Curated annotation (Swiss-Prot):
It comes from Acidovorax ebreus (strain TPSY). Its EC number is 6.1.1.10. Signal peptide: none annotated. GO terms for molecular function: ATP binding; metal ion binding; methionine-tRNA ligase activity; tRNA binding. Pfam families: Anticodon_3 (PF19303), tRNA-synt_1g (PF09334), tRNA_bind (PF01588). A motif ('HIGH' region) lies at residues 13-23. One of its GO terms (cellular component) is cytosol. It is found in: Cytoplasm. InterPro entries: aa-tRNA-synth_I_CS, Anticodon_Met, Met-tRNA-synth_bsu_C, Met-tRNA_ligase_1, Met-tRNA_synth, Methionyl/Leucyl_tRNA_Synth, MetRS_core, MetRS_Zn. This is Methionine--tRNA ligase.
C-alpha cells in the first residue's frame, strides 16, 4: 500500500494571550491523529503558527510599549512550555507576519483579482471620533442584524454564526471608547463570494459528503438559501466579503493599494501554507512541487466557532486562485466543565493548562481523557472531575497499566527476562486482540478516538479476565508449573505490547517507556501482527503511571485568590529608588511670591517674581494659570528648586521651578496644587 502524503494544521491562536484549554484540546486531537497516521507509515507535515495581525495586536502592543512584532514574539516565546508539556509535536511553528505569509497572501490576492473575484467599492465605515481612527470589526459591538443577539462583534455573530458588515449592526458602539461611531466613506476591496462560480463550487464542495461532517454540512446549507431568523426576518444567499482594512493597521499591505491592508481573516489561513513553506525551506525542499502533488491531502482541525471562514472563504480563495482545496475540515466542539457549565476561573470551573502541569498532573491523563471523549463530531465535550478520576484510575491504570505489572516481575525474576512459548489458549486471546487492529485504526482515521479507546479497554478486560483465570501468582507457588507460568506471563506481556500500540497515538510517552522496557524499537500498527517470540529479552519493569488524587483535582479547580488591585498613588508609579546623595543634589528652598502676573500670549503660564532670601529676586514661569489667579498667589510662600539651570523660554528666562502637585490623569482628576509651607518658614530656608 502506497504511503499517503498529508499536510495537517490546527487553527492559529491569536497572538495576544496564552493558550487556554480549548487550544490544548484541539492540538491534542490533531497530534493524536497525526501520530496515528505516522504509525501507518504515512508522511505527515504538521504545522502551526501564531495569528499575528489585526488591530487588537496593534493596540495591545502600543499599551505594552512594544512594537507589534516584539509583542507577538514575546507571546510566541511562551508557547513551547504548553506544547512540550502535553507532548504536542508540531513540525513547525511560525507566525502570519512571516515573509512567506506576506508573499503568499499577496500572490493569492493578485491571482483572485486576475480571475475576476476582486472588486472595489466605496463603503461607509465606522470611525471612532474620540480615538480618531477607523474601527476594526472586533472593536465595534452591537446587536446582530440576523438573530438580534446583543453585544456581538462587527464581523460575525457568535450566537447564530452569521457574517455581516459592521454597518449592519444595530445600535453599534466603540469597544475602545464606548462612543457611538460615526460613518465615514472609504474605498474597500471585496472578494466576490456571491459570484455564481463561487456559489456553484461551494455548494458542491460543502455538500458532497467528503470535506465536512454531516452536521457541519447541514449548518452550511442554511447559508446558501433563504434563512428565517428568530425575529421572523429573512436573510438570503452568500454575501461578498470585505477583505480590506484602513490604516492604521498591523497587517499585510494590499500590493496595489497603499494604505490598505488585508483583513486578518484573509491572511490568517494563508498562514497554514506559509508555515508549511517555512518548514520546507528549512529542509531545502520545493514548496511548489510539494503542493502540486495531486496525491497530497490537506486537513485543517478547527473549532465550531470558525466554520464560516474555513468552509466558505478559505476553500473559495484557494479554488479561484488556482490552488489545491482542503481535503477535509475537521470541526470539534467546545469544552465545558461539570455537566455543561462554562469555564470560569473565578467560580473554580476553569481548567488552566499550566496550572495542571505545575501541580505535577500527568499530561497523558488529560490526553487519555480527551481521547476517550472526542468522537469526530463537533459536539461539546465535558470535563467532569469525578469522571476524569474514574477513567484514569480505573480504566487507564486499573485495566491497562496493571496488566504489565501483573506479569513482568515473574518474567524478570524467574526467567531472566526471557519470554517463552505461548500455548493455544494464549494464542486465541492474542488473535482476538490482533483482529481489532483494523477497526481501531479506522476509528483513529475517523478521529473517533472515543471508539478507539473503548475498543481497547474492552480488549484490556479480556486480558485481565485471562490473568484472573490463570492466576500467575498462584502458578508461581506451585512446583512443576514453571512452563505454564512463563506461558501465561508471556501472553500477558505480548497482549500488553499490542494494547500499547493501540494507545500509542494518545499516550506517546507511555509507549516510549514501554518500548524501553520491552527492548523494542518504536512500533507501528503493522507490528501488532509480529509477536516478540520465545527467547526475546525484556528489561526490568518500572512503574509507568501514578493514580490521580482528589487533592490534585481540588487544587486544579480551586478558584484563584481575589486579585488585589494595585494602588498607584496619583496615577503614577513611584520613581526608582535614589540615594541620599542623589536627593542632596536638589536644592529646595522656601520662596516668597513677591509678584504674580499673567503672561501675554499664553493661557497656561503665570510669571512669578520670587524672593528666595538671596537679596535679589528671581523670575520663574509656572504652568498653573488654569488653577490660580495672580492675586491669589501674591504674598504667599511656596517651595522652589533653587539650583535648576536657567531655561530660556519664548516669554523670557525662567530661573527655577515652583513645586506643584497634580494627578497623572488630568482629565479624570483635574487640578494643579502649588505647595505652601506651614507658617513660620522664611524665604531662603532649605528643605532637608
Amino acid at each position: 500500500m502506497t504511503a499517503r502524503k498529508i499536510f495537517v494544521t490546527t487553527a492559529l491562536p491569536y497572538a495576544n494571550g496564552n493558550f487556554h484549554i480549548g487550544h490544548i484540546m484541539e492540538y491534542i486531537q490533531a497530534d493524536t491523529w497525526v501520530r496515528a497516521q505516522r504509525m501507518q507509515g504515512n508522511a505527515v507535515n504538521f504545522v502551526g503558527a501564531d495569528d499575528a495581525h489585526g488591530a487588537p495586536i496593534m493596540i495591545a502592543a502600543e499599551k505594552a510599549g512594544k512594537t507589534p512584532q516584539q509583542f507577538v514574539a514575546d507571546i510566541a516565546a511562551g508557547r513551547k512550555q504548553y506544547l512540550d508539556g502535553f507532548h504536542i509535536a508540531f513540525d513547525n511553528w511560525s507566525n502570519t507576519d512571516s515573509p512567506e505569509n506576506h508573499e503568499l497572501s499577496q500572490q493569492i490576492y493578485l491571482d483572485l483579482k486576475a480571475a475576476g473575484f476582486i472588486e472595489t467599492r466605496t463603503i461607509e465605515q465606522f470611525f471612532d471620533p474620540e480615538k480618531n481612527m477607523f474601527l476594526p470589526d472586533r472593536f465595534i459591538k452591537g446587536e446582530c442584524p440576523r438573530c438580534h443577539a446583543k453585544d456581538q462583534y462587527g464581523d460575525n455573530c457568535e450566537v447564530c454564526s452569521s457574517v455581516y458588515a459592521p454597518t449592519d449592526l444595530i445600535n453599534p458602539y466603540s469597544a475602545l471608547s464606548g462612543a457611538k461611531p460615526v460613518l465615514k466613506t472609504s474605498e474597500h476591496f471585496f472578494f466576490k463570494l456571491s459570484d455564481p462560480r463561487a456559489v456553484e463550487f461551494l455548494t458542491e464542495w460543502t455538500q458532497n459528503g467528503q470535506h465536512v461532517q454531516p452536521e457541519v454540512a447541514a449548518k452550511i446549507k442554511e447559508w446558501f438559501g433563504t434563512r428565517t431568523n428568530p425575529d421572523g426576518t429573512t436573510s438570503e444567499g452568500l454575501d461578498d466579503w470585505d477583505i480590506s482594512r484602513d490604516a492604521p493597521y498591523f497587517g499585510i499591505e494590499i500590493p496595489d493599494a497603499p494604505g490598505k491592508y488585508f483583513y486578518v481573516w484573509l491572511d490568517a489561513p494563508v498562514g497554514y501554507l506559509a508555515s508549511l513553506k517555512n518548514l520546507l525551506n528549512k529542509r531545502g525542499e520545493d514548496y511548489d512541487a510539494y503542493m502540486a502533488d495531486p496525491q497530497l491531502e490537506q486537513y485543517h482541525f478547527i473549532g465550531k466557532d470558525i466554520i464560516t471562514f474555513h468552509t466558505l472563504f478559505w476553500p473559495a480563495m484557494l479554488k479561484f486562485s488556482g490552488r489545491k482545496t482542503p481535503t477535509k475540515i475537521c470541526v470539534h466542539g467546545f469544552m465545558t466543565v461539570n455537566n455543561g457549565e462554562k469555564m470560569s476561573k473565578s467560580r473554580g470551573t476553569g481548567l488552566d493548562p499550566l496550572k495542571y502541569l505545575a501541580l505535577g498532573m500527568n499530561p497523558e491523563w488529560l490526553r487519555y481523557y480527551l481521547g476517550a471523549k472526542l468522537n469526530g463530531k463537533n459536539e461539546d465535550i465535558d470535563f467532569n472531575p469525578e469522571d476524569f478520576m474514574a477513567r484514569v484510575n480505573s480504566d487507564l491504570i486499573g485495566k491497562y497499566v496493571n496488566i504489565a505489572s501483573r506479569a513482568a516481575g515473574f518474567i524478570f525474576k524467574r526467567f531472566g527476562g526471557k519470554l517463552g512459548e505461548v500455548s493455544a489458549d494464549g494464542q486465541a486471546l492474542l488473535a482476538q486482540l490482533r483482529e481489532q487492529a483494523g477497526p481501531i485504526v479506522a476509528a483513529y482515521e475517523a478521529r473517533d478516538t472515543a471508539r478507539a479507546v473503548r475498543e481497547t479497554m474492552l480488549l484490556c478486560d479480556r486480558v485481565n479476565s485471562y490473568v484472573d483465570a490463570n492466576k500467575p501468582w498462584e502458578l508461581a507457588k506451585q512446583e512443576g508449573m514453571e512452563a505454564r507460568l512463563q506461558d501465561v506471563c508471556t501472553t500477558c506481556i505480548e497482549a500488553f505490547r499490542i494494547l500499547t500500540i493501540y494507545l500509542k497515538p494518545i499516550l506517546p510517552q507511555v509507549a516510549a517507556e514501554v518500548a524501553r522496557f520491552l527492548i523494542v524499537p518504536p512500533e507501528q500498527f503493522a507490528e501488532v501482527a509480529q509477536p516478540l517470540g520465545a527467547g526475546h529479552q525484556i528489561g526490568q519493569y518500572q512503574h509507568l503511571m501514578q493514580r490521580v488524587t482528589q487533592e490534585q483535582l481540588d487544587a486544579l479547580f480551586e478558584p484563584p485568590a481575589p486579585a488585589v488591585e494595585k494602588v498607584i498613588p496619583g496615577g503614577e508609579e513611584i520613581a526608582p529608588t535614589i540615594t541620599i546623595d542623589d536627593f542632596a543634589k536638589v536644592d529646595l528652598r522656601i520662596a516668597k511670591i513677591v509678584k504674580c502676573e499673567a503672561v501675554e500670549g499664553s493661557t497656561k503660564l503665570l510669571r512669578l517674581t520670587l524672593d528666595a532670601g538671596e537679596g535679589q529676586t528671581r523670575n520663574v514661569f509656572s504652568g498653573i494659570a488654569s488653577m490660580y489667579k495672580p492675586e491669589d498667589l501674591q504674598g504667599k510662600l511656596t517651595v522652589m528648586v533653587a539650583n535648576l539651570a536657567p531655561r530660556k523660554m519664548k516669554f523670557g528666562l525662567s530661573e527655577g521651578m515652583v513645586l506643584a502637585a497634580s494627578h497623572a490623569d488630568e482629565k479624570a482628576h483635574p487640578g494643579i496644587f502649588v505647595l505652601e509651607p506651614f507658617p513660620g518658614a522664611q524665604p531662603g530656608m532649605r528643605i532637608h
